[in-house]
From Swiss-Prot:
It is found in: Secreted, Cell wall. Keywords: Cell wall, Disulfide bond, FAD, Flavoprotein, Glycoprotein, Nucleotide-binding, Oxidoreductase, Secreted, Signal. This is Berberine bridge enzyme-like 8. There is a cross-link at H108-C172 (6-(S-cysteinyl)-8alpha-(pros-histidyl)-FAD (His-Cys)). Residues 1-20 form the signal peptide. PROSITE patterns: FAD_PCMH. Disulfide bonds join C31-C93. GO terms for cellular component: extracellular region; plant-type cell wall. InterPro entries: BBE, FAD-bd_PCMH, FAD-bd_PCMH-like_sf, FAD-bd_PCMH_sub1, FAD-bd_PCMH_sub2, Oxid_FAD_bind_N.
Length: 527
């Protein structure tokens, strides 16, 4: 009897919520229509849950299958903005109706916070993918890039105008510009030119009052915050003006692998000594995973070295034969190609393929989990051997080591909100991918175990993390009151932004005291 009553009550509440939601949606839509520019109707950009195109729009930019299940909380509405006035209307009406707004650029938020809520409350998504113009000015070596563009589009349209200009951003072409820049995105030219945020010079955004601001109007504090302080906390960035950097007509890339049986331990031990000190033009990432050994029943560790050198093969070989002979690089390992083709190479696309592949926004997706760390001291051989043993035991998680040094060590930790500069040898990305939903709990736990095992080898007090490798294991914010929100926000905020966190909080409090722009890991307001 008790369970029957509970069931009846559940359906009564469900029916009430559904009818209430329907009425609220209608009122919300009326608000959107009346607050947008009639010359640019917003109605075609609105997709309701249950609408024929809703699912395809929602799923188009879901990059992690963990958040594309039947149990995943869905927005009641998506605004796929096609004009800046649609963004203004979304903010105005979201505030008026006290609705949470999620902001999605490319959908690469590893824990889905740009299109999923953990609160259980109704929310809508402002999807920026239609606002993706890339306006390149070769004469000034700058470009205005809307935040709905993907990196592949940015690279392609720069290449169309110049074969010797580039932008030092990430290696994944489907990553959205908005999230990438706002979180301090990096790529394989960071040792030469720094991060994305070190190469922006202006921005246009919509603030909490629906006003469009450029750098001059918003002021240097707010500009500082949106340039590496994380997206979704201060407003909606419409576009960034970026500085383009010079690259030679041809660069050199290589990808070679070594296993434990091929002296991988000695090579990695040497890599950590030299990779952060090599010429700024050279970036050598290493990806470490577990593979079958020479005996099929045995596992071994494989280290794959992937490099970008802003120069020719002869010069590269001269550098590495002198500074890093343990790697054993030979000319046949190297490929000399254009910068735009090197982008394809780093995406595991064969050199010589059409550059138009960079314009493709769709890619195969997996279930995945990512975590991050920073290493400030070299790891001993004994330490490395213990790590290999643990990886073989866990088998699934991988690690990618991304070397620092160069320009990264010359820029102050307070110039942008991104704090991790000098003193860091390399950054670690932990990762696991899988295709079967039933493996989710196991693979996530294996990734966490490797992260936990690495504790003695990485930064401390705080244990540093990279904002763009979103990780809700570091804490989430329920936004239930300013005091608890600040305490919860500090838990993850200090790990992402270190000493810059408090300045971000002050700016957030000044520009959005009502905390309209929020998600589970946004910057909180002062209590």
């Amino acid at each position: 009897m008790k369970y029957a009553l509970i069931l009846v009550l559940f359906f009564v509440v469900f029916i009430w919520q559904s009818s209430s939601s329907s009425a609220n949606s209608e009122t919300f839509t009326q608000c959107l229509t009346s607050n947008s520019d009639p010359k640019h109707p917003i109605s075609p950009a609105i997709f309701f849950s249950g609408n024929g195109s809703y699912s395809s729009v929602l799923q188009a930019n879901i990059r992690n299958l963990r958040f594309n299940t039947t149990s995943t909380p869905k927005p009641f509405l998506i605004i796929a903005a096609t004009h800046e006035s649609h963004v203004q209307a979304a903010i105005t009406c979201g505030k008026r109706h006290n609705l949470q707004m999620k902001i999605r650029s490319g959908g690469h938020d590893y824990d889905g916070l740009s299109y999923v809520t953990y609160s259980g409350k109704p929310f809508f998504v402002l999807d920026m993918f239609n606002l993706r113009s890339v306006d390149v000015d070769v004469a000034s070596k700058t470009a205005w890039v809307q935040t709905g563009a993907i990196l592949g589009e940015v690279y392609y349209y720069i290449w169309e105008k110049s074969k010797t200009l580039a932008y030092p951003a990430g290696i994944c072409p489907t990553v959205g510009v908005g999230g990438h820049i706002s979180g301090g995105g990096y790529g394989n030219m960071m040792r030469k030119y720094g991060l994305t945020v070190d190469n922006t010079i202006d921005a246009r955004m919509v603030d909490v009052n629906g006003k469009i601001l450029d750098r001059k109007l918003m002021g240097e504090d707010l500009y500082w915050a949106i340039n590496g302080g994380g997206g979704g906390s201060y407003g909606v960035v419409l576009a960034y003006k970026i500085n383009l950097v010079e690259v030679p007509e041809n660069v050199t890339v290589f990808r070679i692998s070594r296993t434990l049986e091929q002296n991988a331990t000695d090579i990695i031990h040497r890599w950590q000594q030299v990779a952060p000190k090599l010429p700024d033009e050279l970036f050598i990432r290493t990806v470490i995973d577990v593979v079958n050994g020479t005996v099929s029943s045995q596992k071994t560790v494989r280290t794959t070295f992937i490099a970008m050198f802003l120069g020719d093969t002869t010069t590269l070989l001269s550098i590495l034969n002198r500074r890093f002979p343990e790697l054993g690089l030979v000319r046949s390992d190297c490929t000399e190609t254009s910068w735009i083709q090197s982008v394809l190479f780093w995406t595991n696309i064969q050199v010589g393929s059409s550059e138009t592949l960079l314009l493709q926004r769709n890619q195969p997706v997996n279930y995945l989990k990512r975590k991050s760390d920073y290493v400030r001291e070299p790891i001993s051989r004994t330490g490395l051997e213990s790590i290999w043993k643990k990886m073989i035991e866990l088998e699934i998680p991988t690690m990618a080591f991304n070397p620092y040094g160069g320009e990264m060590g010359r820029i102050s930790s307070t110039v942008t909100p991104f704090p991790y500069r000098a003193g860091n040898l390399w950054k670690i990305q932990y990762g696991a991918n899988w295709r079967d939903e039933t493996l989710t709990d196991r693979y996530m736990e294996l990734t966490r175990k490797l992260y936990q095992f690495m504790t003695p080898f990485v930064s401390k007090n705080p244990r540093q993390s990279f904002f763009n490798y979103r990780d809700v294991d570091l804490g989430i914010n329920s936004h239930n009151g300013k005091i608890s929100s600040y305490v919860e926000g500090k838990r993850y905020g200090k790990k992402y932004f270190a000493g810059n966190f408090e300045r971000l909080v002050k700016i957030k409090t000044r520009v959005d005291s009502g905390n309209f722009f929020r998600n589970e890991q946004s910057i909180p307001v002062l209590p």
